[in-house]
UniProtKB/Swiss-Prot annotation:
Top-rank taxon, per record: Bacteria
Localization of this protein: Cytoplasm
This protein's UniProt keywords: ATP-binding, Chaperone, Cytoplasm, Nucleotide-binding, Stress response
Protein name: ATP-dependent protease ATPase subunit HslU
Organism, scientific name: Methylobacterium radiotolerans (strain ATCC 27329 / DSM 1819 / JCM 2831 / NBRC 15690 / NCIMB 10815 / 0-1)
Gene that encodes it: hslU
Subunit-level organization: A double ring-shaped homohexamer of HslV is capped on each side by a ring-shaped HslU homohexamer. The assembly of the HslU/HslV complex is dependent on binding of ATP.
Length: 437
């Protein structure tokens, strides 16, 4: 779990996301509160429940990007899902409890990675010995082994082929069978390969010919897993989910009931009702054991173009007590998105063209023109936020991108006049497209 202060979390998000200070503050405080709760002792620690968040804002203003960046910062089990993927319990499709099962799998992956790091030195030594055994045989003299060990460490034997016995997981072609109504069996999907493997005496190694350089990764994973206690790992992963798990529930506005519909919708109101106990706190059966969701943090987000937050079930609104509104982006925001963020669109474009030997330069008035065109098209057609910049920028560099191979060594300056020339028909075409079937 991250130990960053709220200020540090916000400044880290600022590197990639322009504006939206209120949303950044809300998620930073929520993330820090996870750490604060861990410092409490006794019964009070169990009583402190996470304050779930509802982020409201137009499309393309940074809601999903905040989730992506938060996942890297959290250093805790984090899962981003779309609310539209789920259906009401009892119907064909994924039910909302699958969220917790997926979160447990994420936690197991994180915990396994951490455990592997802890035994890395021992695993490296074991992997090296297995490669040496394959190269010179287990009965070789110590002097021979030392000589080959030196060559191995100096990468002199990387292109040599060896035969190793690697334990393989189920073959890729083995089918998955769904068994309806099996709780916690990962949607009831049973891998026949796993079942056959266990019936035939476990995962026995299969001799494979492989280059020395390619052998290290599978051998390291195999030797690390031998040194890790799987049962303890799963217990630790479940504990991490229960105390530090974070679920980002995107597109929650799409599961609001349609006006004028009296019956519950399979993938709308029914899903909202199923989410209630999950967010409030319940116990979900998974194939690794029961998981409590009392202290899992839920961050929901939606554009609410057609519906409004009040259209959500009142009980669901009550379970998302912190409400944050994200602001539509302005011309200045667009200019910052183009230039100021760490992996800005202009930096990406310039770097891509440099691979062809073409040097692109954007003048300040070109950046201003790009931002203004994006805002104009958003206001006249459909507001898709920062995503509009990609449309405009691709239109501007389309010709350069197509002919870049023939222009190696050139420097291509892009100014406001060039931008206007390339995008002059964009807004009018977009307007006309409304009337063309």
């Amino acid at each position: 779990m991250t130990t960053f202060s709220p200020r540090e979390i916000v400044s880290e998000l600022d590197r990639f996301i322009v504006g939206q200070h209120d949303a950044k503050r809300a998620v930073a405080i929520a993330l820090r509160n996870r750490w604060r709760r861990q410092q409490l002792t006794g019964p009070l620690r169990e009583e402190v429940a996470p304050k779930n968040i509802l982020m409201i804002g137009p499309t393309g203003c940074g809601k999903t990007e905040i989730a992506r960046r938060l996942a890297r910062l959290a250093n805790a089990p984090f899962l981003k899902v779309e609310a539209t993927k789920f259906t009401e319990v009892g119907y064909v499709g994924r039910d909302v409890e699958q969220i917790v099962r997926d979160l447990v799998e994420v936690a197991i992956g994180l915990t396994r990675q951490a455990k592997r790091e802890g035994v890395k030195a021992k695993a490296e030594a074991a992997a090296e010995n297995r490669i040496l055994d394959a190269l010179v045989g287990p009965t070789a003299s110590q002097a021979t082994r030392d000589s080959f060990r030196r060559k191995l460490r100096n990468s002199e034997l990387d292109d040599k082929e060896v035969e190793l016995e690697l334990t393989s997981s189920a073959p890729a072609g083995m089918p998955m069978f769904e068994i309806p109504g099996v709780p916690g069996a990962s949607m009831g999907a049973i891998n026949i390969g796993d079942m056959l493997g266990k019936a035939l005496g476990g995962q026995r190694g299969k001799p494979r010919r492989i280059l020395v350089r390619d052998a290290y990764a599978p051998l390291m994973a195999e030797e690390s897993d031998k040194l890790v206690d799987d049962e303890a790992l799963v217990r630790e992963a479940i504990r991490e989910v229960e105390n530090n798990g974070i679920v980002f529930l995107d597109e929650i506005d799409k599961i609001c009931a349609r006006e004028g519909r009296s019956s519950g919708d399979v993938s709308r109101e029914g899903v909202q009702r199923d989410l209630l106990p999950l967010i409030e706190g319940t116990t979900v059966a998974t194939k690794h054991g029961p998981v409590k969701t009392d202290h899992v943090l839920f961050i929901a987000s939606g554009a609410f173009h057609v519906s409004k937050p009040a259209d959500l079930l009142p009980e669901l609104q009550g379970r998302l007590p912190i409400r944050v509104e994200l602001q539509p982006l302005t011309v200045d925001d667009f200019k910052q998105i183009l230039t100021a963020t760490e992996a800005s669109l202009l930096k990406q474009t310039v770097a891509l063209m440099e691979t062809e030997g073409v040097t692109l330069t954007f003048t300040d008035d070109a950046v201003d023109a790009l931002a203004r065109v994006a805002v104009e098209v958003n206001s006249s057609v459909e507001n898709i936020g920062a995503r509009r910049l990609q449309t405009v920028l691709e239109r501007v560099i389309d010709e350069i991108s197509f002919t870049a191979t023939d222009r190696s060594g050139e420097t291509v300056p892009i100014d406001a006049a060039y931008v206007r020339e390339r995008v002059q028909d964009l807004a009018s075409n977009a307007d006309l497209s409304r009337f063309i079937l």
